[in-house]
Amino acid sequence: MAYAEVPEFMAALELREGVSARALAFTVLTAARSGETREMRWAEIDFDSRMWIIPAQRMKAAKEHRVPLTDAALNLLAERGNDCDLVFGSDVKPGKPISDMSMTSVLRRMNRNSVTVHGFRSAFRDWAGETTAFPREVIEAALAHRLKDKAEAAYARGDLFDKRRQLMVAWAALITGDKRTNAHLHDA
């Protein structure tokens, strides 16, 4: 899906009920991988610092990843009941995460047959690279991508968290239609 279509999609998704629809919305808001969202635990969320800390063992790069949480993401979490350890636990199998096909099923029910959950990460990447002034390394860090250049990676010890927060606020503003925060779009 092209990034320009994501705001309309998110408005339609907001009308959908169910844990899988909420998980999909959270995944799009955070540009996370679907497995990271499906396995998300309440204990990983630091509400005071407004961040989600994904443990290394659940990350593709095997390195802990801190995800800045926007108002939209926090509001979505506030709507969830924390009756189990998992944020997006299965309604069918209590105590288990939603299935790996559950978010894809939401897309199919919305007649978005050519769209994949992972494609929203591509939409985020395209939007950030084409329409904002955020540096490439901030965008790649938001996607939890490893630096390909080993020499560059050896010196990159920080995670650019504050800059990534600005990026995620701008993304949330775009896809939720929150014009109050669009001032961050080009302030990298």
Language-model features, listed with the residues they occupy:
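Short coil/turn helix-boundary motifs
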Residues: L13-E17, T30, R80, T132, ...
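DNA-binding alpha-helical recognition surfaces that contact promoter or target DNA
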Residues: E39, W127, A141
